[in-house]
Amino acid sequence: MSRLQFQLQATDGAARRGQLSFPCGTVQTPAFMPVGTYGAVKAVLPGQLCDLGAEIILGNTFHLFLRPGLEVIADHGGLHGFMRWNGPILTDSGGFQVFSLAHRRKISEQGVTFAAPTDGAQVFLGPEESMKIQKVLNSDVVMIFDECTPYPATEDVARDSMELSLRWAQRSRDAHDALDNDAALFGIIQGGVHPDLRGRSLDGLQAIGFDGYAIGGLAVGESESERNVILEYLHPRLPVDRPRYLMGVGRPEDLVESVARGVDMFDCVMPTRHARNGQYFTGFGTVKIRNACYARDVDPIEPGCGCPACVGGYTRAYLRHLDRCNEMLASMLGSLHNLWYYETLMANMRAAITAGTFFTFRHSFYLARGLDPPPLPEVASCAG
């Protein structure tokens, strides 16, 4: 029996408000998961993540397997003890990272052989290996091992990739169960930008049975409209009583539009990566702190913001100075602000769904940026 319980608490159109319950904590959905690739969210302490509103974080199976290795993490009792994070952790399977290696990998029915980016050594990773690694990591949500369908891809290529991922999904399920792992196991829907293939993938995954369903392969270069078509197609077909996770998609606009199409969970490196590159998210758009107009700007990043950087009185001029001098404090303060913005955005969407005002919230979200809200399809007004 999985350690995860999911409760759907409210809907507003297709937008869903729910709760994930684990022995180590609860997660309110829609939820954004900060990414801790190497066992840390860059420039942010675990305790600060809690203060920012994060309730679940993501760890990277592929990178942690290569460095520091499973023995070191096992010495700490798993990833929670290693990271000093007491809340829930989701680990990806390593499939996307292997996909990103491009010319340094060879895919077979059994799995993937690749040259490790750390030392060039030949490494094999398949469904069984991924499940064993994630068992040692002791994460609360385990992802199946899949092949991330490339973009662009012909329908034949996307079909072959999707069918391989389905066979790997069954092997992941079998291996996970054989390990007697009570962590939740999520399936990953593939099929590229072809709705019928996505539907076949979902049907196959539901026949196997999973605790949640992720939508993979939608952060690899496709257009926003192509992504939305897939979300709109899947929304009425996904089981209502299982969480839905859109992998790797993370602009604020993407989060709002995906919540409007029924998504519950998100992850992305964007908040911290953009902070390290001098870009700060606000309700009125993005502050690009390297622009000369901020050289003597004594306002905080966003007046009225409750993050430590803004409440602390750090000005745009100061942050620009730190950034230009490559001071790590710029990355720290910017990451705190961006993660606060993301977690607050999710909290505001949750409150709006509960109140039945999500589409009013969505309209205001765009107006604050000086934009007209994009049109919504009929599916977004259908509960599920």
From Swiss-Prot:
One Pfam family recorded for the sequence: TGT
Alphabetized UniProt keyword annotations: Glycosyltransferase, Metal-binding, Queuosine biosynthesis, Transferase, tRNA processing, Zinc
Catalytic activity reported: 7-aminomethyl-7-carbaguanine + guanosine(34) in tRNA = 7-aminomethyl-7-carbaguanosine(34) in tRNA + guanine
Annotated region (RNA binding), positions in chain: 248-254, 272-276
Binding-site list for substrate: D92, S93, G94, G95, F96, D146, Q190, G217
GO biological process: queuosine biosynthetic process; tRNA wobble guanine modification; tRNA-guanine transglycosylation
Active site: D92, D267
InterPro entries listed in its UniProt record: ArchSynthase1/Queuine_TRR, TGT, TGT-like_sf, tRNA_ribo_trans-like
Class in the EC hierarchy, top level: transferase
Signal peptide region: none
Cofactor entry: Zn(2+)
Organism superkingdom: Bacteria
GO MF annotations, alphabetized: metal ion binding; tRNA-guanosine(34) queuine transglycosylase activity
Pathway, per record: tRNA modification; tRNA-queuosine biosynthesis
Any Gene Ontology CC annotation: cytosol
Cofactor mode of binding and number, as noted: Binds 1 zinc ion per subunit.
Stated family: Belongs to the queuine tRNA-ribosyltransferase family.
NCBIfam families, sorted: Q_tRNA_tgt, tgt_general
Function field: Catalyzes the base-exchange of a guanine (G) residue with the queuine precursor 7-aminomethyl-7-deazaguanine (PreQ1) at position 34 (anticodon wobble position) in tRNAs with GU(N) anticodons (tRNA-Asp, -Asn, -His and -Tyr). Catalysis occurs through a double-displacement mechanism. The nucleophile active site attacks the C1' of nucleotide 34 to detach the guanine base from the RNA, forming a covalent enzyme-RNA intermediate. The proton acceptor active site deprotonates the incoming PreQ1, allowing a nucleophilic attack on the C1' of the ribose to form the product.
Subunit (UniProt): Homodimer. Within each dimer, one monomer is responsible for RNA recognition and catalysis, while the other monomer binds to the replacement base PreQ1.
Protein name, entry field: Queuine tRNA-ribosyltransferase
